[in-house]
Regions:
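N-terminal cap/lid segment of alpha/beta-hydrolase-fold proteins
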Residues: 1-31
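Catalytic nucleophile-loop/oxyanion-hole region of alpha/beta-hydrolase
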Residues: 44-47, 73-103
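Conserved alpha/beta-hydrolase
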Residues: 54-77
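Alpha/beta-hydrolase fold nucleophile elbow
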Residues: 103-114
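Alpha/beta-hydrolase-fold enzymes
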Residues: 113-194
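Short beta-strand/loop motif that positions the catalytic acidic residue
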Residues: 216, 222-224, 228
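Conserved alpha/beta-hydrolase "acid-adjacent" motif
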Residues: 229-235
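Catalytic active-site module of serine/aspartate enzymes centered on a nucleophile-bearing elbow/loop
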Residues: 249-282
Length: 282
């Protein structure tokens, strides 16, 4: 599924950890490339949702890559299941290495959406020297679930790790009915429900990040919609407040919902991302 078929990008894959085939899309920079952006989608998403974003950034001189995490999009693996968010981070690592090899010497930025933001943060903690900056969009650090429910899921993940327990509503991702209709018709996310183990591992990754935000030193851009029902803007505020980076920016979008780059008003969000990257490429 690509909301903008004229900007689908070229499809590729590489052998990831455990031999799984990891799919990704790539968009070549228009003219001489100035930098690189690697995109990490979250739940109810995949690389196909970033065609319009990537084509615009490519026109601005960026080589853009978007990964399908294992078990998602067109990548191999049990659907939506993960043993550890470290496995997702290994998928990101594989794509980053490919992007660096194809664009030697260029600054590389990493953008993660929602759960993809958690993955991006986990990856960044171990690879800050390779990155020029981190962009976290609708960061899934705090979610609208009580602590006791999260604790129960962590326990259940040991007993029934493959049980599917969390289904996000597509209508909470965008106020644009065209986007929601496209999501509803997308076979790659049809009936997407997260297994107990996946949800528990995200909670464990968030626990780790809580102790590690002060270790971030690279430039960070944090974006969140005030009406996001899938993740809490307070989580992005917490990241901003505790990040060790001296170059950090928090942008809240009044009235926007979960998928900022596919929501009404997405043009302003992309303009802000583009301006932020441009300012650091000078």
């Amino acid at each position: 599924m690509d909301l903008h078929l004229e900007a689908t990008g070229s499809e590729h894959s590489f052998a990831g950890k455990d031999g799984l085939n990891i799919a990704y899309k790539a968009w070549s920079a228009v003219g001489t490339p100035r930098g690189v952006l690697v995109i990490v989608p979250g739940f109810n998403s995949h690389s196909g949702y970033y065609g319009w974003v990537a084509s615009n950034l490519a026109a601005d001189g960026l080589a853009v890559y978007a990964v399908d995490l294992r078990g998602r999009g067109k990548s191999d693996g049990e659907r939506f299941y993960i043993d550890s968010f470290g496995d997702y981070a290994s998928d990101v690592d594989g794509l980053v290495k490919l992007a660096i090899a194809a664009n030697p010497g260029l600054p590389l930025y990493l953008l993660g959406h929602s759960a993809g933001g958690v993955v991006a943060c986990i990856y960044t903690l171990e690879h800050q020297t390779q990155l020029a900056g981190l962009i976290c969009e609708s960061f899934a650090y705090q979610v609208p679930a009580p602590d006791f429910a999260i604790a129960a899921l962590k326990g259940l993940s040991h007993l029934a790790p493959h049980a599917h327990v969390l289904k996000l509503a597509n209508k909470d991702f965008s106020r644009d009915p065209v986007v929601v209709a496209a999501m509803d018709a997308d076979p790659l996310i049809a009936n997407e429900t997260q297994p107990t183990k996946t949800v528990a591992e995200m909670a464990r990754a968030d626990d780790r990040l809580k102790q590690s935000f002060g270790q971030f030193t690279l430039p960070v851009l944090i974006l969140h919609g005030t009406e996001d029902k899938a993740t809490r803007p307070s989580g992005s505020q917490f990241f901003y407040d505790h990040a060790g980076s001296t170059d950090k920016t928090l942008q809240l979008y009044d009235g926007h919902v979960h998928d900022l780059l596919n929501d009404i008003g997405k043009e302003q969000v992309l303009a802000d991302i583009t301006s932020w990257i441009d300012a650091r490429l000078r």
